[in-house]
Swiss-Prot record:
Nucleotidyltransferase listed as a keyword: no
Basic residues composition bias: residue spans: 492-501
Protein name per the record: Major capsid protein L1
Compartment annotation: Virion; Host nucleus
InterPro entries reported in the protein's UniProt record: Capsid_L1_Papillomavir, Capsid_L1_sf_Papillomavir, dsDNA_vir_gr_I_capsid
Keywords assigned: Capsid protein, Disulfide bond, Host nucleus, Host-virus interaction, Late protein, T=7 icosahedral capsid protein, Viral attachment to host cell, Viral penetration into host cytoplasm, Virion, Virus endocytosis by host, Virus entry into host cell
Gene Ontology biological-process entries: endocytosis involved in viral entry into host cell; virion attachment to host cell
Chain intervals for the UniProt region annotation (Disordered): 472-501
Principal cellular location given in the protein's record: virion
Gene Ontology, cellular component aspect: host cell nucleus; T=7 icosahedral viral capsid
Main function: Forms an icosahedral capsid with a T=7 symmetry and a 50 nm diameter. The capsid is composed of 72 pentamers linked to each other by disulfide bonds and associated with L2 proteins. Binds to heparan sulfate proteoglycans on cell surface of basal layer keratinocytes to provide initial virion attachment. This binding mediates a conformational change in the virus capsid that facilitates efficient infection. The virion enters the host cell via endocytosis. During virus trafficking, L1 protein dissociates from the viral DNA and the genomic DNA is released to the host nucleus.
Length: 501
């Protein structure tokens, strides 16, 4: 007997599937380049925590293990004074910037930053044990210092980068939860903002929610979140706005090993060990942990203070700065020295500890240089529809809008809107454009008045001219040698005569 197949038949969608188009397909690049650079960017603060007085931050937290996310604001090229007015037609075209080169300059000497905790949950030294630990007392915390994992990172895109970390999840309603149970974990993806902590070697997690004793990690991360860049999510971005390219260098090794004090929430199963007598009858803590170390800091492995040229981005956006924004995210732990300062309370001929107050500060120095290329976009109906699907705010910045579809219903419009005799009317929507990043923290760098076409007057511009083969403009005229006369001389030649001997 014949029977139809039980397998599922998949029918293709009736409409064609939309395809993401690379920016090179509709963006035309010109041969006009501009150089732009920031001023010397400096930051000074306490490396472990912010100092507050009367609920006001007087000294911010500035650590070598924080993300520095620069929000670079560019001028509108459509309102820019161009050297050639015939480059584009404002009725059918719009101009955009393309980032073709950059250099992130770092000041200050190389150094290793030390962090720690005066009350760290360290119980036994399990690397070189002198004896078997018994039951811990009420409080076994000690003062421990360490250095962190070494990281150098630079990410460039026209949208803020994404980071991932593990946070506290939500238990199911049918699960009974007791005090002291291990909380569920949830992978959280969020925007990396300026001042967020990087992964220091203890994992990318929310230490404030997942370590309630505030003693398992050093001071600068025990009450905050450490994020790691979500490279997988940014690489899967269909438009490629968050990550044009990135530079990364990480290294770490485990320096010391010890275990934690406290009750082991999930004891070692009995079938994995044979208990002994005396002090071996009770098993010691099996919660092992290490102290990280970034090892040697050397100038031979530096990612900064050198130019990088963007020929082809990893995504579909090949360096186009939509919205006239560019985000540069920097991490450099090779310059994480924490300076100690001392101030005397009173002058004395003999040294006394109480006569001096000790302080800590961390300083950072940056310099950003860019090469931007002027590009044009022809506003065809197909291109405008695609850009509206990708990012509608781009068309709004270009003073374009889509007309709503016709409404078949008859709408009511009152003459006296403020009258108390009629029902309350809906508030009019705000016409001013809202900044999508107003609730986020970034280090804003305004380059609206820093553009220059004289590339040969700047270090990065001269490197670009040498690399690309373009000729820079010269401001002074050089002397031109007059060409020599090519026609033969009319003076008669003297005949040679032979002399008789």
């Amino acid at each position: 007997m014949w029977r139809p197949s039980d397998s599922t038949v998949y029918v293709p969608p009736p409409n064609p599937v939309s395809k993401v188009v690379a920016t090179d397909a509709y963006v035309k690049r010109t041969n006009i380049f501009y150089h732009a650079s920031s001023s010397r960017l400096l930051a000074v603060g306490h490396p472990y925590y912010s100092i507050k007085k009367v609920n006001k931050t007087v000294v911010p937290k500035v650590s070598g293990y924080q993300y520095r996310v620069f929000k670079v604001v560019l001028p509108d090229p459509n309102k820019f004074a161009l050297p050639d007015s015939s480059l584009f037609d404002p009725t059918t075209q719009r101009l955009v910037w393309a980032c073709t080169g950059l250099e992130v300059g770092r000041g200050q000497p190389l150094g290793v930053g030390v962090s720690g905790h005066p009350l760290l949950n360290k119980y036994d030294d399990v690397e070189n044990s002198g004896g078997y630990g018994g039951n811990p007392g009420q409080d076994n915390r000690v003062n421990v210092g360490m250095d962190y994992k070494q990281t150098q990172l630079c990410m460039v895109g026209c949208a803020p980068p994404l980071g991932e970390h593990w946070g506290k999840g939500t238990q199911c309603s049918n699960t009974s939860v007791q005090n002291g149970d291990c909380p569920p974990l949830e992978l959280i993806t969020s925007v990396i903002q300026d001042g967020d902590m990087v992964d220091t070697g203890f994992g990318a997690m929310n230490f404030a929610d997942l370590q309630t004793n505030k003693s398992d990690v050093p001071l600068d991360i025990c009450g905050t979140v450490c994020k790691y860049p979500d490279y997988l999510q940014m690489a899967a971005d269909p438009y490629g706005d968050r990550l044009f390219f990135y530079l990364r260098k990480e290294q770490m090794f485990a320096r010391h090993f010890f275990n934690r004090a406290g009750t082991v929430g999930e004891p070692v199963p009995d079938d994995l060990l044979v208990k002994g007598g005396n002090n071996r009858s009770s098993v010691a803590s099996s919660i092992y942990v290490h102290t990280p170390s970034g090892s040697l800091v050397s100038s031979e492995a530096q990612l900064f203070n050198k130019p990088y040229w963007l020929q082809k981005a990893q995504g579909h956006n090949n360096g186009i700065c939509w919205g006239n924004h560019l985000f540069v995210t920097v991490v450099d732990t090779t310059r994480s020295t924490n300076m100690t300062l001392c101030a005397s309370v009173s002058k004395s001929a003999t040294y006394t500890n109480s006569d001096y107050k000790e302080y800590m500060r961390h300083v950072e120095e940056f310099d950003l240089q860019f090469i931007f290329q002027l590009c044009s976009i022809t506003l065809s109906a197909e291109v405008m529809a695609y850009i509206h699907t990708m990012n509608p705010s781009v068309l709004e910045d270009w003073n374009f809008g889509l007309s709503p579809p016709p409404n078949g219903t008859l709408e009511d419009t009152y003459r006296y809107v403020q009258s108390q005799a009629i029902t309350c009317q809906k508030p009019t929507p705000e016409k001013e454009k809202q900044d999508p990043y107003k609730d986020m923290s970034f280090w804003e760098v305004n380059l609206k008045e820093k553009f220059s076409s004289e590339l040969d007057q700047f270090p990065l511009g001269r490197k670009f001219l040498l690399q690309s083969g373009y000729r820079g403009r010269t401001s002074a005229r050089t002397g031109i040698k007059r060409p020599a006369v090519s026609k033969p001389s009319t003076a008669p030649k003297r005949k040679r005569t032979k002399t008789k001997k």
